[in-house]
Amino acid sequence: MAPRSQSKSQREPLRKRSREDADNSNDTNEDAAIQEVDADFEEVAGLLGTDIADPDQKQKQKQSKDEKRLQELTKPKVSNTSEAEADEPGVNYSFEKADFSEPTMKAIKEMGFQKMTKVQAKTIPPLLAGRDVLGAAKTGSGKTLAFLLPAVELLYSLKIKPRNGTAVIIITPTRELALQIFGVARQLMEYHSQTCGIVIGGADRRQEATKLAKGVNLLVATPGRLLDHLKNTQGFVFLNLKALVIDEADRILEIGFEEEMKQIIKILPNEDRQTMLFSATQTTKVEDLARISLRPGPLYINVVPEKDVSTADGLEQGYVVCDSDKRFLLLFSFLKRNIKKKIIVFLSSCNSVKFYSELLNYIDLPVLDLHGKQKQQKRTNTFFEFCNAKQGILVCTDVAARGLDIPAVDWIIQFDPPDDPRDYIHRVGRTARGTDGKGKSLMFLTPSELGFLRYLKAANVPLNEYEFPANKIANVQSQLTKLIKTNYLLHQSAKDGYRAYLQAYSSHSLKTVYQIDKLDLVKVGKSFGFDVPPKVNITIGASGKSIEKKHKKQKRDRK
């Protein structure tokens, strides 16, 4: 989708590249350096024309109790299906005509739903009829309701009671997605007598075991914690299992739960069990998992025609070509100019997220951070706080890239490039959600990474090239370097972030695109505030060459 034209008076500097822009994008004279580091950053921010937000503002915000937040923030967004979907012959898009039970219909009405999305309309009828389903759908398509509604109806029709134990298990890759699914399940089961629960890593295991012993009819779980309870919780009754849902199967396998899933499938009873497996992509590993979990002859449902683009219609997508040493300067400028927007910034490693969030908060640009090394309570609080915010910035790893329904996100910034087109699609899927959703995305690429665009084109992802004119980018490099040099804690955090960035870069699967040998380590170091890159020993490639040796070679080449 082509980017909208912008006037000079608009505050967002993002626009489509033109030859005239490129010719005129020379640096303007920088203001005289200011003595104190904090004052330096404040003046640059002032030159950008945006007031600095109170750094304590977010800490002072009153937070709701967990129960209230679960009810409010996990509620699915209501949107009508398009006419093209509703007019498809032979497909029922009406919840009223789907023959749901009275308690379920009452909950659906209270949640505000009237028409099904395409994936719901295609998937719910065969699931209600007891078929096993292997489903593929674009992110944000309403898949959660597509498997939850038949699961709730199954519990109702069998008149399952808490003493019968767990009859439905839903497995999902991340804790945040599990929390979201659990919240929706609770709303759907509001007028049912059956019980629902959740078990996730990082939560109180003893508390979970107590609830399981009392009887949880519908259980939402992450793989590792579920396997733990299956093996070690004596009061966990699961012999009456009637339905198994595996959501985001490709992601579950990508993050290393292949062995756990095989063990779970082996432990769970499979007699008369209905299985629903959803995956955005059909990899060999997903096919293997489907083979051992689904009954013979499952129904395959794909609601994404190959000719369609892989991302949402309301999403404007672009990329910017930027040398490594200018990456943070560009990010800082962009965030300051869009301080009133709701933005997610994706990075490739936990320590990089930690450093940049600490840095941005220190220079009075308030951000939240979310990554896999945080304690579960911190992750949950951060997730709900950002969901509830009308504006704000979330710096995160790909832990937030899949399935999460975060309301009204304006921008997705891929500061570190995604591993492959699937990761790109799931990252940008956090905005422009629902039928009428709108949003924008911007991906940072260095000149050596432009080959990734070929892969996106092959995956039917339309992108425009954008440019930030150089005179619109705040040159805070000297202030950044001074800050990292004088602040011990930030210096250590920057060093950890730098090392983690290189480790993540060397682990990319697209080796022809992300070639760590082509990285200019001096420029990479500058984006972390170092004049001279710190010494790190990371072995790269089959040759066993280390990052430190590569840095010495680059220094020799410059002499």
From Swiss-Prot:
Region: Disordered, residue numbers: 1-90
Broadest EC class assigned to this enzyme: hydrolase
Biased composition annotated in UniProt, kind: Basic and acidic residues: 9-22, 55-75
Keywords carried by this UniProt record: ATP-binding, Helicase, Hydrolase, Nucleotide-binding, Nucleus, Ribosome biogenesis, RNA-binding, rRNA processing
Pfam families: CTE_SPB4, DEAD, Helicase_C
GO molecular function, one term: ATP hydrolysis activity
Motif Q motif, residue range(s) on this chain: 93-121
Gene3D superfamilies, per database record: P-loop containing nucleotide triphosphate hydrolases
InterPro entries, sorted: DDX18/Has1_DEADc, DEAD/DEAH_box_helicase_dom, Helicase_ATP-bd, Helicase_C-like, P-loop_NTPase, RNA-helicase_DEAD-box_CS, RNA_helicase_DEAD_Q_motif, SPB4-like_CTE
Catalysis: reaction(s): ATP + H2O = ADP + phosphate + H(+)
Localization, UniProt: Nucleus, Nucleolus
DEAD box (motif): residue ranges: 247-250
Binding positions for ATP per the UniProt entry: A137, K138, T139, G140, S141, G142, K143, T144
One GO term of the biological process aspect: maturation of LSU-rRNA from tricistronic rRNA transcript (SSU-rRNA, 5.8S rRNA, LSU-rRNA)
Its EC number(s): 3.6.4.13
Domain Helicase ATP-binding: 124-300
GO CC term (a single one): nucleolus
Organism superkingdom: Eukaryota
Residue ranges of domain Helicase C-terminal in the record: 314-484
Function according to Swiss-Prot or TrEMBL: ATP-dependent RNA helicase involved in 40S ribosomal subunit biogenesis. Required for the processing and cleavage of 35S pre-rRNA at sites A0, A1, and A2, leading to mature 18S rRNA.
Subunit comment: Associates in the nucleolus with the 60S and pre-60S ribosomal subunits.
Free-text domain note: The Q motif is unique to and characteristic of the DEAD box family of RNA helicases and controls ATP binding and hydrolysis.
Family: Belongs to the DEAD box helicase family. DDX18/HAS1 subfamily.
Name of the molecule in the record: ATP-dependent RNA helicase HAS1
Gene: HAS1
